[in-house]
């Protein structure tokens, strides 16, 4: 008896629809007899929040086009982005719905059931970390947003927020314990 981990890639377009909800359906092939811990994995893109330099007639001073004080764009992700991206999860087997819950439910379950250490791990996995939702106060910054500066020397700018993979555990009824699993027979 052995345990094998495998990855199931989504078959279809991998872009999120910005006008309507995106529905992703996965079919679990019968690689084994039982299905255990299950995760959704999303990749957040790298974000560059720039400060643009507009040259004026007087010279290359930093000002906006109207001559007013310049306020740069400061992008940040929302808190609990990994679970807030999920509106609904439904698990089917043989055409029968076995479970249905939301990303908000996953969040509430974390707050209700997990220890402090497990919450910290969950937050790192799902992207609920200051580097994503409060970059102006993360990584040693204090109310100082890490804007990307594009310079004339051709060097690549440092991103404001680095891209990363989010791992969202689908804590279904068969994932509660290592002794539990969903039969794939």
Task: Label every model-predicted segment.
Residues 1-185:
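Short, low-complexity Pro/Thr/Gly
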